[in-house]
């Protein structure tokens, strides 16, 4: 099928105006050939040749009229649920904003979260975000990305409003990048800042430290139930699905036991592009957290990353002194209530998108 740009130029002398609507709230007026008048109602579609938004008149063989030059506005672009088939488009959208590919992170998100997006009429995605549910009482919003060409047009507000509606009565939280334009938007929607999360990364340089009473070992299948129980207490909700997917992805999962053999903490280490990410990191105290980080990071020759909450300043200083230097921060924001659980024992999240 031929793109209509040339065809329209030949038929200018035989045109009349015809109204159609891409959405109930966005009428548009186009000039159409007289031969097509009264024969069909214009129907929006995507051109198979150039992927621009178009209107098909009469039949595919008669006319395809391009409307790419019309400003449809954010209200004319519907929000849809994304699937694994959209993963490549999400990675491409993130790259538009300078984000690294992070294939493992995206696969994890699509496995445990609900992804929503707005299509770019010219192809690809104009915006997307994910919602991760932890039961009915808690949910996380992450990877809110709007293509640079669609910036400042309200797509982010529409997406966030949609995610809050989907979350229902749940407390919703997110980590807003320090360089993000999103924080004023989130504040206007009722989010409030409660903490910071700082990304520490680099080559880990271990130092001698006092031995931890108890033991440290690789996790086994028999540890899953005790780990899940500890995590529910600390996190304040059941994130068993996230942990199950993550442990399948992780290179190492370690558990720490106290002197009586009780579970004192655990950590997972998973590969995200060039970094070995440590998270989640759940520990009874600072000493256990340090021991778990050391055990994981000391065996890695490349870059190690751990995201540390602002409330754990002593751990952050300890990590920086061993080569894991601060290299970016985010503001932890919450909507609809307070975060549940014993958060002082949650030293590092799985990721900023999931918590």
Regions found by a protein language model. Give the residues of each.
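Polybasic, low-complexity intrinsically disordered segments
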Residues: 1-12, 31-41
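Surface-exposed beta-loop interaction hotspot
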Residues: 199-225, 230-231
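Conserved catalytic-core motifs of GNAT/GCN5-like acyltransferases
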Residues: 171-177, 192-206, 326-338
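Intrinsically disordered, low-complexity, positively biased terminal segments
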Residues: 59-76, 83-88, 108, 119-121, ...
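Conserved hydrophobic beta-strand within the GNAT/NAT acetyltransferase core sheet
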Residues: 141, 173-178, 306
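Conserved active-site tyrosine of GNAT-family acetyltransferases
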Residues: 186-187, 191, 319
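Cysteine-centered motifs
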Residues: 3-5, 36, 47-50, 58
């Amino acid at each position: 099928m031929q793109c209509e740009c040339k065809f329209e130029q030949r038929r200018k002398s035989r045109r009349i105006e015809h109204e159609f609507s891409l959405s109930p709230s966005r009428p548009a007026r186009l000039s159409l050939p007289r031969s097509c008048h009264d024969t069909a109602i214009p129907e929006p579609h995507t051109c198979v040749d150039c992927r621009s938004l178009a209107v098909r008149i009469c039949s595919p063989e008669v006319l395809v009229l391009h409307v790419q030059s019309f400003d449809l506005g954010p209200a004319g672009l519907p929000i849809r649920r994304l699937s694994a088939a959209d993963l490549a488009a999400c990675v491409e959208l993130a790259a538009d904003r300078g984000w690294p590919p992070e294939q493992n992170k995206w696969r994890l998100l699509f496995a445990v979260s609900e992804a929503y997006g707005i299509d770019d009429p010219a192809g690809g995605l104009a915006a997307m975000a994910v919602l991760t549910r932890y039961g009915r009482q808690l949910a996380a919003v992450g990877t809110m990305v709007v293509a640079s060409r669609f910036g400042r047009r309200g797509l982010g507000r529409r997406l966030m409003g949609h995610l809050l509606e989907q979350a229902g009565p749940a407390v919703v939280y997110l980590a807003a990048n320090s360089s993000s334009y999103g924080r004023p938007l989130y504040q206007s929607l009722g989010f409030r800042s409660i903490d910071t999360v700082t990304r520490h990364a680099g080559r880990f340089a271990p130092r001698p430290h006092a031995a931890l009473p108890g033991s440290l070992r690789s996790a086994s299948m028999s540890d899953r139930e005790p780990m899940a129980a500890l995590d529910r207490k600390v996190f304040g909700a059941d994130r068993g699905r996230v942990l199950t997917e993550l442990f399948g992805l992780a290179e190492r999962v370690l558990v720490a036991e106290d002197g009586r053999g009780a579970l004192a903490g655990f950590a997972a280490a998973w590969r995200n592009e060039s970094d070995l990410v440590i998270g989640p990191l759940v520990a009874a105290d600072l000493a256990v957290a340090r021991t778990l980080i050391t055990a994981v990071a000391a065996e890695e020759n490349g870059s190690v990353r751990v995201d540390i909450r602002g409330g754990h300043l002593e751990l952050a200083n300890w990590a920086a002194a061993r080569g894991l230097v601060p290299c970016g921060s985010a503001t932890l924001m919450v909507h609809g209530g307070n975060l549940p659980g014993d958060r002082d024992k949650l030293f590092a999240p799985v990721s900023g998108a999931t918590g």
